[in-house]
Every structure is written in structure tokens, then in C-alpha cells.
Amino acid sequence: MKHFEANFDGLVGPTHNYAGLSFGNVASLSNAALVSNPKAAAKQGLQKAKALADMGMVQGMLAPQERPDLYTLRRIGFSGSDANVLKQAAKEAPMLLNACCSASSMWTANAATVSPSADTRDGKLHFTPANLVDKLHRSIEPLTTGRILTATFSDPHYFHHHSHLPEHNSFGDEGAANQTRLCNEYGHAGVELFVYGQEATNPNAPKPQKYPARQTLEASMAVARLHQLEEDNCVFIQQNPDVIDQGVFHNDVIAVGNQNVLFYHEQAFLNTQHKIDEIKRKLDTELYFIEVPTAKVAINDAVKSYLFNTQIITLPSGEMAIIAPTDCQENPAVFAYLNELLTLNTPIKQVLYFDVKQSMQNGGGPACLRLRVAMNEMEVAAVNQHTLMNDALFARLNLWVDKHYRDRLTTQDLADPQLIIESRTALDELTQIMKLGSVYQFQR
């Protein structure tokens, strides 16, 4: 049976804007109040997804969240008509309105943690939506995320869906952005690397001082238990608190893995060699640990260019390629390193550059935009086929974006009641295109 690693990219929502909501994310904060282009953002994401599908990759799309989120605004005391709720919130609590209009669900690396059937005791693919409790604008996502995942991976014979973890900082969970999986072949049992920022229940353990550690060890261990993973299938690694304080808010900003390759910065982890030895003990295959030294790429350059927020994919030919943002080409140190990497004796033979600037300016590169799901061909066949990228879906979604999306959006525009109508009309049509059913609150 054939096995694949599918990528499910987040479709950028109609309210994509730059509100600077993500403390600890340097790009998000530094670009606050820029004018955004939701239409361009959605099309950039679709272009990347279609390019991977054209390379022979299994590529899907995940629907965005409903925004503005009027239900949250009503929960916190704003009342009256929908237009009045927006007007009140804009006047009395503009940052809360901004949080309820965020299109951050485009970064599906944070949507959930996924464990493939090759790793789990019950032989099913497991999904746990991330609770994202560290950031208000993301903490309102998990319920709808769960519905979208269930509508996409609906067959209970193959897919096991869990609820998100308790909504408390002790279980702060940011999903697959802090998890990577090493294996020989996608269909073989692998080792899942769970990277955490702090131990919530141990006040003496190392933790960052400037920016929050969004992922806890307690959350990572809870997800591993839910997913029925054996101890031999897991390695728990602490991210270096110093790099979190330099803007590395998720592990996928400083490391990325694929099959038998782990590509990471030398400052990424604590106790790096000890953890590499543990990986080698638990995974009996040839492994490539590609450590990028600070002398070649400084942390600041890694964060600005998102060198590690790249995708490493295995092409149908068996060679690996890096999917990088064009920002990596524009940074001399990073571009020089990537060119050097291609001359080294590793499975990575190509670097392909994509323009995802609308996402990058909000703090998310190519790896943020995708949720990896390793599957066999029977599981792929059980996926909602209307979510899988092909020529027809690409054309239809581009027409849908042209019809419904604005090409200019400011934070002041978020108070426009017309945005509610535009967004709901678009999402209602999208659920019909992708055959998702009533996943949104306004449809229920």
C-alpha cells in the first residue's frame, strides 16, 4: 500500500488584516496597522497549494473560521443588532473587536496535532484541535476547528477526533507547530517530537523571561496519551527559552523535520545532544541531523526570513525539496546557507521559493500555512474529496475569492457591518463548494 504525507493548507479568510495581536511574534507586532489585501493573501495561499499538488503531492485545503466572531462579542456583553455589536465593540474595546476579526486560522500548523495510524495503538489517525489559550484571538478557534476537521476527515473507521485540551495555561497547546515526526517511510512507525516551552507545574524549570512559552510539557504529554502513542514513539524536547525571547514563538520558527531529516538551528533546543541520542535509540534508521550554526545564520536572520518555517517535502521521485518564502532569497546570509545546503550530502536536493508575503507580514511562513497528515491510500480515499486540491477546485476557489474578497482592508474597516454580510455569504458558499455541512455558528 502507498503512503503519503498530505499537506492541508489554511484558506485565508475574508477578514485578513494586520492588527498586531500576537505578542512574542516579531513580524506580527512590527507590521501592526498596515493595510492588508485579503484577496492577494488568499490567492498567494492557493498558488502555493496548487504548486504542491502539481508536483504530485497530496494537497488539501481547510476552511477558515467565521469572522467577525459576533458570538464571542455577545458573550462578553455587546448586544443589539449585529451592526450595533460591531459599533459598540469598535468604540469601547477596539482590541477585542480586532481579536474577533482575526484571520489567524489560516495558519493550520496551529489547528491541531495529528498522529498517523502507523504510530497509534488503535491504528487510526488521531486529531486533537489546539486550544491556543495563550492568545485571545486564537483561543476562540478550537470548536469550529474541530467541526472543520471532522467534516474533512469524517470516516470514523479511519479517523479519531478528540476535543481540545482544558482551556488553562497549564495545558497551553499550539498544535503541530510544536510537533514534528521522524520516520523511515511515512507508513512505518515513527518518532513524534513534541517540543515545549515550559513545564507549567514546575516553577523551578527553565522558561523564557520576555515572551510567553505557549506550549507546556503537560499539554504535549496529554496529547501523546490521547493519541495512544507508546513511549518509544515519543521524544519530549524543551525549546531553548533564550530563542523564545528572541521571537521564536513556535518551534516551527527554528526547526523542521521530514522523514529522516531534522533541520534545526544550533540554539533551537535545550540538551540537544542528549535528545538526539534519544531519537537515535528510538528510531533505527539512517538519520540526517542538519544543524545550522549561529556563525552562518543568526537567530535574527532566521526569524526575519523564516528559514525554518519552510516545508520539507518528499517529492514523488524520492528527493526532498524545501518550500521557502521569497524572504529567504532576500536575506543574504540565509540565501547563501540554502545554496550551500544543496551541496551537502543530505536528501534535500532543491529549494523552491514562493511569495507568501501577506502571510509573512503577519508572522506566518509556508510551514505555518499547512497541517501535515501522513496517510495511506485508503485513508486518502476516505477524506472528503471536495477538500483536495486539483485543477477544478483551484479554479473554483479563485473565482470564489474574486467574487467575495476585498483587496484592501484596514483595522478601521473591521467595524463595517457590511463585512459581516460579505464574510457569511462567502463562507456559506464555501461550505457548499467543499461539502462541509453546517460547520459555522451562523448556519446552525
Curated annotation (Swiss-Prot):
The family assignment reads:
Belongs to the succinylarginine dihydrolase family.
Q: What is this protein called in UniProt?
A: N-succinylarginine dihydrolase
List the catalytic activities from the record: N(2)-succinyl-L-arginine + 2 H2O + 2 H(+) = N(2)-succinyl-L-ornithine + 2 NH4(+) + CO2
Which Pfam families does the entry mention?
Answer: AstB
Give the enzyme's main class according to its UniProt record, as a single word: hydrolase
What InterPro entries does this protein's entry cite?
AstB_sf (IPR037031), SuccinylArg_d-Hdrlase_AstB (IPR007079)
Q: What does this protein do?
A: Catalyzes the hydrolysis of N(2)-succinylarginine into N(2)-succinylornithine, ammonia and CO(2).
- HAMAP family under this entry? AstB (MF_01172)
Record-annotated residues binding substrate? Answer: 19-28, 110, 137-138, 214, 252, 362
Name a GO molecular-function annotation.
Answer: N-succinylarginine dihydrolase activity
Report quaternary structure and partners: Homodimer.
Task: Could you list this entry's UniProt keywords, alphabetically sorted.
Answer: Arginine metabolism, Hydrolase
Record EC number:
3.5.3.23
Which GO BP terms apply? arginine catabolic process to glutamate; arginine catabolic process to succinate
Gene that specifies this protein: astB
* Pathway(s) served: Amino-acid degradation; L-arginine degradation via AST pathway; L-glutamate and succinate from L-arginine: step 2/5
Question: Any idea which residues are catalytic in this one?
Answer: E174, H250, C368
